[in-house]
């Protein structure tokens, strides 16, 4: 089956928001729980929804913590977000070749749009599914299924690209092929345990993989 659709995670996959996310968590947690959290403590918080993460920390303050996080994240967004090499060129080429491309993210739409605008990727994506659009987040298949439906695409003709196990398992649950990115903060070996179909060392590897898949 040939691939005609590519779905991407956003944070840590298309744009480097790692420092923004870590700083947002540390700011929020230092505000409410001084001297209790270090950088390494917040790394596992990257991937799940803010609600899931903060519920485990203090269920009575979830909305307050989310508000604090999002305010800091918004205020410091443009200074802390960086690009990944070959991402822009790869997405541009996918569009040129006629692929359907979409984003499936556990982030709120407002900050998604900020990131896409800053990286100039906003012109390329036909569909962007955010946490605001679904009841269940990755690895539940709902966000991917919604994106595929909006793109009029079949799961067996789609590839999900991401930097977290939520992306890989989400793709598997939705019935797509999966590609993990080796630049994940979680480490290449960690993602390999979830058995993605492909591992990208840089985003442009995707073009070669798709070319090989669609030739066979």
Swiss-Prot record:
Name the CDD domains on file: HAD_PPase
UniProt KW Hydrolase keyword: yes
Biological process GO terms, please?
A: DNA repair
For this record, the Gene Ontology CC terms, alphabetical, are: cytosol
Active site, renumbered: 9
According to its UniProt record, which cofactors does this protein need?
Mg(2+)
Superkingdom = Bacteria
Q: Which UniProt keywords apply?
A: Hydrolase, Magnesium
Catalytic activity of the protein: diphosphate + H2O = 2 phosphate + H(+)
**Protein EC:** 3.6.1.1
The record's Pfam families line, in alphabetical order, gives: HAD_2 (PF13419)
Q: Which GO terms describe its molecular function?
A: inorganic diphosphate phosphatase activity; magnesium ion binding; phosphoglycolate phosphatase activity
Q: Which HAMAP family match?
A: Pyrophosphat_PpaX
Quote the function comment for this protein.
Hydrolyzes pyrophosphate formed during P-Ser-HPr dephosphorylation by HPrK/P. Might play a role in controlling the intracellular pyrophosphate pool.
Which family is annotated?
Answer: Belongs to the HAD-like hydrolase superfamily. PpaX family.
Q: Which PANTHER family match?
A: PHOSPHOGLYCOLATE PHOSPHATASE, PYROPHOSPHATASE PPAX
Q: What is this protein called?
A: Pyrophosphatase PpaX
């Amino acid at each position: 089956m040939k691939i005609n659709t590519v779905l991407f995670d956003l944070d840590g996959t298309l744009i480097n928001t790692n420092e923004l996310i870590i700083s947002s968590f540390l700011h929020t947690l230092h505000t409410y729980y001084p001297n209790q959290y270090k950088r390494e403590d917040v790394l596992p918080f990257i991937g799940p929804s803010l609600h899931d993460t903060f519920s485990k920390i203090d269920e009575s303050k979830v909305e307050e913590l989310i508000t604090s996080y999002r305010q800091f994240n918004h205020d410091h967004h443009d200074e802390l977000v960086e690009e990944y090499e070959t991402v822009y060129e790869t997405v541009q080429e996918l569009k040129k070749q006629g692929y359907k491309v979409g984003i499936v993210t556990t982030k709120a739409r407002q900050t998604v749009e900020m990131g896409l605008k800053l990286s100039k990727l906003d012109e390329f994506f036909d569909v962007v599914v955010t946490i605001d659009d679904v009841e269940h987040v990755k690895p539940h298949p709902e966000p991917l299924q919604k994106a595929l439906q909006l793109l009029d695409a079949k799961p067996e003709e789609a590839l999900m690209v991401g930097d977290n196990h939520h992306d890989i398992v989400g793709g598997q649950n939705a019935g797509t092929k999966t590609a993990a990115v080796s630049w994940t903060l979680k480490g290449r070996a960690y993602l390999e345990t979830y058995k993605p179909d492909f591992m990208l060392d840089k985003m442009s590897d995707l073009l070669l993989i798709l070319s090989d898949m669609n030739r066979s």
